[in-house]
């Protein structure tokens, strides 16, 4: 967790966020596509979410679709008015990787998603994953439930929402921030488990087999070869 704090501070310095190693960082790495990725839902709630949740920060490192700057401009204005609680940056591979390494939660709001990868990368970097319960995210994000809260065992790697509206995204992020406010001991135990399970699940052979399975399903169940 100390390494994540170091990455967080470096990310904050590079992006103009308030420097606070104890902030809870929500990282959006998906392209700014209102037809698939749900960026309009993010725009509706971002400012209010960081106002209500004083320990939260939101970072977006992404480009629009093609030459469309509509949502980049909207998010830029939201970030400018946030007093260092929200940052928008155009996509850069190095900055995006640092964002994953700094994040507590990697999130999105997809209307549909055949596969999706941001949850996998986030888990590998020690972040929970939050997204809409659809497609690949339905298959890969499992609700985080803890034995100490009554679950038979510690399971899950993130948080899902069903309704494609701002309230749905708000609901899932609120559940995520509640987890990230828990004691260091609890968080550290679960993040280590999530990272271990992600490494086991997303080794190269397993990932190839999973993608073949998904594309065969999209192909009407017919084998690809």
Q: For each predicted feature, which ranges?
A:
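Glycine-rich phosphate/pyrophosphate-binding loop
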Residues: 1-22, 170-185, 196
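A conserved mid-protein helix/loop that constitutes part of the nucleotide-sugar donor-binding site
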Residues: 34-47
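Nucleotide-activated donor-binding/catalytic signature segment of Leloir-type glycosyltransferases, i.e.
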Residues: 53-98, 155
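A charged, aromatic-enriched C-terminal amphipathic alpha-helix characteristic of glycosyltransferases
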Residues: 182-213
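Catalytic binding pocket for nucleotide-activated donors in carbohydrate/polymer assembly enzymes
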Residues: 98-189, 198
């Amino acid at each position: 967790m100390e390494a994540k704090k170091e990455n967080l501070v470096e990310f904050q310095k590079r992006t103009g966020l308030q420097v606070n190693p104890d902030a809870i960082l929500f990282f959006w790495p998906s392209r700014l596509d209102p037809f698939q990725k749900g960026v309009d839902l993010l725009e509706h709630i971002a400012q209010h979410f960081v106002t209500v949740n004083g320990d939260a920060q939101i970072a977006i490192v992404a480009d629009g679709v093609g030459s469309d700057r509509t949502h980049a401009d909207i998010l830029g204005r939201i970030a400018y008015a946030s007093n260092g609680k929200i940052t928008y940056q155009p996509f850069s591979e190095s900055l995006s990787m640092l964002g994953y390494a700094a994040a507590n939660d990697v999130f999105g709001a997809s209307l549909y998603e055949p596969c999706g990868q941001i949850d996998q990368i986030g888990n590998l970097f020690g972040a929970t994953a939050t997204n809409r319960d659809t497609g690949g995210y339905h298959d890969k994000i499992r609700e985080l439930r803890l034995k100490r809260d009554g679950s038979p065992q510690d399971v899950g790697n993130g948080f899902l929402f069903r309704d494609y509206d701002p309230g749905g995204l708000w609901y899932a992020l609120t559940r995520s921030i509640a987890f990230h406010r828990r004691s260091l001991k609890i968080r550290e135990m679960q993040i280590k488990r999530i990272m271990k399970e992600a490494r086991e699940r997303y080794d190269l052979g397993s990932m190839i087999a999973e993608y073949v399975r998904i594309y065969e399903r999209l192909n009407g169940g017919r084998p690809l070869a």
